[in-house]
């Protein structure tokens, strides 16, 4: 779980693989509240249950399909689009923590040459064949570029807090 605001990025926590989507959703909701996040993006590759659990908590999180269509015609898919935006963000002064694992993961994927000139990022399967781990920390940065984020209004915060009140049949 990570946070990007403007030119600053930090990893809030790392979680071991967990099959309990509710626990992950509760932790994500806590960070959303503590950090006053304007948007939460969840990797659709394993996060559909997390988003469903979040809906039960009154949350409106966005699933991101890395293989989905890119809004940038120069990119093969959403994954390539997000990597390109992260690259541009870093070039413009984006700051990442002093984390050797994150640094290595950001440098690991290679671009795949294509006849049509579109940017394609090496697949995780191909990275694994080269002996590289899945770039989970890097993915937590690049997913923050999935869609434009609009600052929430104070009314949005009230809607979330009021939607999480428990029903009391005796009240």
Q: Where do the protein language model's features map onto the residues?
A:
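Gly/Thr-rich phosphate-binding beta-strand-loop-beta motif of the actin/hexokinase/Hsp70
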Residues: 1-6
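Mg2+-dependent endonuclease catalytic cores in nucleic-acid-processing enzymes, primarily RNase H-like
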Residues: 7-119, 160-171
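Charge-patterned, long linear interaction tracts outside catalytic cores
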Residues: 98-158, 163
């Amino acid at each position: 779980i990570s946070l990007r605001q403007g030119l600053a990025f930090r990893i809030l926590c790392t979680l071991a693989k967990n099959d309990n989507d509710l626990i992950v959703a509760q932790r994500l909701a806590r960070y959303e509240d503590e950090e006053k996040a304007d948007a939460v993006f969840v990797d659709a590759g394993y996060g559909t249950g997390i988003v469903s659990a979040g809906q039960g908590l009154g949350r409106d999180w966005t699933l991101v399909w890395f293989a989905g269509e890119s809004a940038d015609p120069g990119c093969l898919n959403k994954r390539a689009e997000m990597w390109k935006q992260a690259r541009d963000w870093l070039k413009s002064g984006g700051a990442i923590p002093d984390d050797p694992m994150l640094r290595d993961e950001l440098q690991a994927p290679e671009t795949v040459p294509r006849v049509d000139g579109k940017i394609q990022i090496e697949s995780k399967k191909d990275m694994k064949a080269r002996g590289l781990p899945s770039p989970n920390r890097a993915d937590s940065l690049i997913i923050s570029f999935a869609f434009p984020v609009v600052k929430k209004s104070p009314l949005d915060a009230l809607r979330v807090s009021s939607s999480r009140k428990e029903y009391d049949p005796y009240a």
